[in-house]
Amino acid sequence: MTTDPRNLSRGTAAALDGWIDGAVHIYPLRVQYEDTDAGGIIYHSNYVSFAERGRSACLRCLGIRQEDALAALQQGDREAVMLVVRRVEADFLMTAGLGAELRVETALLKLGGASMKLQQIIRHVEEGMKIENGHILARLLVDIGCVAPHVDGGKRPRRMPSDLAERLRQALTD
């Protein structure tokens, strides 16, 4: 499934969420002043933030709105589930500076009953460069768990709803 952002009007929210190309979600962004450190390069923790934005945009591209799940939980819906980060492993390979065009690529590595493992690659793409040849700045492995409310007031792992699992499987697997 491919949605090319050039086919979307500039004002649509969909254009802000990137697109799915093959089995990879693509989320473009530009490095802003707030993303850099005193040396003018991307501050290391911002790569994790960029990856989070990419994951959220990926879910929205699949019609999964985290804000709807949060609202359902706040209203006491015991069937509502949230996807939460359990673990992040990050390798910082290169850096980029202010104004750099980046792209966050999100791919599904494994889908379990109540969890999934994603690989996220953050690339620096320079003008005229083939995107697949972009310099890899960071590579993250992210473990996500599916949780639901528990009677004790906390949250516990819960099997991912079948419609959610199927959307992920259809869009992010070859």
Named regions from a protein language model:
Residues 43-45, 49, 101-104, 118:
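Generic detector of contiguous secondary-structure segments
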Residues 32, 66, 74-75, 119-120, ...:
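Residue-identity detector for glutamine
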Residues 2-61:
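Catalytic strand-loop segment that frames the active site of acyl-thioester-processing enzymes
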Residues 36-40, 45-95:
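N-terminal first-folded block
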Residues 31, 37, 79, 155, ...:
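Residue-level signal for pocket-adjacent positions within structured domains
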Residues 28-32, 91, 143:
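Generic structural detector for well-ordered beta-strands
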Residues 7-8, 14-16, 21, 26, ...:
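Hydrophobic, well-ordered secondary-structure segments
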Residues 2-19, 92-101, 108-174:
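HotDog/MaoC-like acyl-thioester-processing domains
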